[in-house]
Structure formats: C-alpha cells, structure tokens
Amino acid sequence: MSASTTATTRHDWSLAEVKALFQQPFNDLLFQAQTVHRAHFDPNRVQVSTLLSIKTGACPEDCKYCPQSGHYNTGLEKQKLMEVQKVLEEAARAKAIGSTRFCMGAAWKHPSAKDMPYVLEMVKGVKAMGLETCMTLGKLDQDQTLALAQAGLDYYNHNLDTSPEFYGSIITTRTYGERLQTLAYVRDAGMKICSGGILGMGESLDDRAGLLIQLANLPEHPESVPINMLVKVAGTPLAEEEDVDPFDFIRMLAVARILMPKSHVRLSAGREQMNEQMQALAFMAGANSIFYGEKLLTTANPQADKDMQLFARLGIKPEAREEHADEVHQAAIEQALVEQRSSEMFYNAASA
C-alpha cells in the first residue's frame, strides 16, 4: 500500500488492512506515516496543550488502569471540584508557558446537575483568555453536551481506551456503546472530538488495531487522537503489566497517523518514561500534539523547559495560534475573575 493512497481520508478500514500496516518493516512504516503527515501538516510544528485535574479521585468507575478509581487503594489524595477562580488562574499560567489549549478533567462517571453550572463558568472564563478549551467529564447526556457547546467548549475528550473485544477485561461500569453514544452527542452538538486509547494493558495486536479501526471508521475522524502508554500505579490491577516495547508504541502512533491523516495525534500519558530518542521517533511517526507542563492529571509529565529544549534540538516549534494583544487577554482574565467574584458559585464550587 503506497503512502499516497493512504493520505486519502477513509472510514472503511478492515482488520486485515490495519494489521498489515502494523506488520510492515519499521522503516517502511515510518516512511509511510511521515509521508502522510507531510501531506496535511507542517512536520516541524507540534500543538501544545495543558491538562488540569479539576476534580481528583473517588471516581465510581472501575477502570483497571486508573489511580483515580474509588475501587482501588492507590494513596491518591482526593480533591473536590476546584473553585472557578483557581481554574482560571491555572489557565492563565498555562497560557503564559506557551499552551494553546487548556484541558480540564474531572474524575466522574458523569457530571451531576449541581456541578454543571461551575463547569460551564470554567469554560467561559478560559475561552475569554484566548485559549482553546477541552474537557473530560465522563459520560454526557444530550442536554449536558448542548450546554457545554453553548458555553463555548471546543473539544470534548472521551477515550475508547481499547478494542470492543478487550474492553470488558478493563472496565465493567460503563459500556463501549455508552462511550460511542457520548462521542455522537458531542459531534451532533458541533464540538470537536478528542478520543484515543491506552497501550500496555495486556491487549493484543488485534486489540490495538481494533481500537484504531473504531476511531478511524467513525463518521468523522476525531480531531485529536491521544495515544497513551500505561502509567503503572501501585494499587491498580494493572500495576504489574509488562512494559510496552518502545518500537510497538511508535508503530501505534504511525498507524494512527496513516488511518487518520488529518487528525492531531497526541503523544500523551507515559511520556515521562520516554527518553528523548523515543520522543523524536514519535514525532517522526506523525505525533504532532503533546501535553505540556508539570502534571498530566495524576501522573508526572516532563517539565516545560525540557520540552522546549528538545523542540529546539529537533527544530520543532509549537503550533501557531491566533494571537491578541496581551492587554486584551489580561482584560479578559480580569473580567472573568470579576464576574466570578460577583457570583455565589465562585465561592462554593469546591464544596458543592
């Protein structure tokens, strides 16, 4: 299969086709992925996001990989929903270190009616700073999805995690169909989709291919596809899983790039365990988005200055964003904070 043919956007990939991509010689696969990547993106630009946990721990879901699950004793400090003011301050700091997108994650099965007003104010406030907004809050119903869209949310993250066949071995508290339904609600509301999965949970090659097929065969490809490497946390059922072979992880990125040529493929959780050479291969394979800053929800993430040093050595620059004068952003931040101070939710979000 030539690189030129795979640059065409498709939604009808078969398991045999995708496994054949995985099984190519490594150099051939990287060449094909890089060729597809260059057809749609500047190969030396990477989109930079910051992720903030706005509510941590005590999640009722039983995802075997997750330290935030209330089913496992991982020693994670539980935190209630963050105050809106604090979220806006963190967003301003993310913008100052170069992020163009601010992602907010809450450890919920689904957001409750009492929490939604605070969440919507967070979206509006971050949006006013000139940042793209992204949230991951669990399963959504149609009304919640429409409310988030009306508040200005740009992206909603809802990962499929793995193939439909392996999914039941990892999670029992939410069905695969529910995840797909949430993605459909998000798309119907006009928001962009961020959806990917995790490597290193004991899945097979068929499962890795199956995950990518689910994503690539959606009616529209996700705009962002995060590929995570399992971060093994003591106390979770997957704490003793074998490490992912670095070349297998790079293959996953490359095949994701080929199947979804216009999507941003994000090098996500697990990057702290990757050396610079592995990260460079990831960018060569077509990864063009990273999380940037100190923490990725509850796991360490390479420090921002290390990222910029690596970018400089590789000749990579952060993806351009629409810029406004600093005083305009400052005015937006100040206005958002003033509005929050005049609202009861500004004070009560953490205890609601």
UniProtKB/Swiss-Prot annotation:
Cofactor: how and how many bound: Binds 1 [4Fe-4S] cluster. The cluster is coordinated with 3 cysteines and an exchangeable S-adenosyl-L-methionine.
Needed cofactors: [4Fe-4S] cluster; [2Fe-2S] cluster
Domain of life: Bacteria
Alphabetical list of CDD domains matching this protein: Radical_SAM (cd01335)
Residues the record lists as binding [2Fe-2S] cluster: C103, C134, C194, R266
Stretches assigned to the Radical SAM core domain: 44-262
Key word 4Fe-4S present: yes
EC number of the protein: 2.8.1.6
Reactions accelerated catalytically: (4R,5S)-dethiobiotin + (sulfur carrier)-SH + 2 reduced [2Fe-2S]-[ferredoxin] + 2 S-adenosyl-L-methionine = (sulfur carrier)-H + biotin + 2 5'-deoxyadenosine + 2 L-methionine + 2 oxidized [2Fe-2S]-[ferredoxin]
Transmembrane segments: none
SMART domains recorded: BATS, Elp3
Pfam families: BATS, Radical_SAM
UniProt cross-references to HAMAP family, sorted A to Z: BioB
Stated family: Belongs to the radical SAM superfamily. Biotin synthase family.
This protein's name: Biotin synthase
Organism: Pseudomonas putida (strain GB-1)
Taxonomic lineage: Bacteria, Pseudomonadati, Pseudomonadota, Gammaproteobacteria, Pseudomonadales
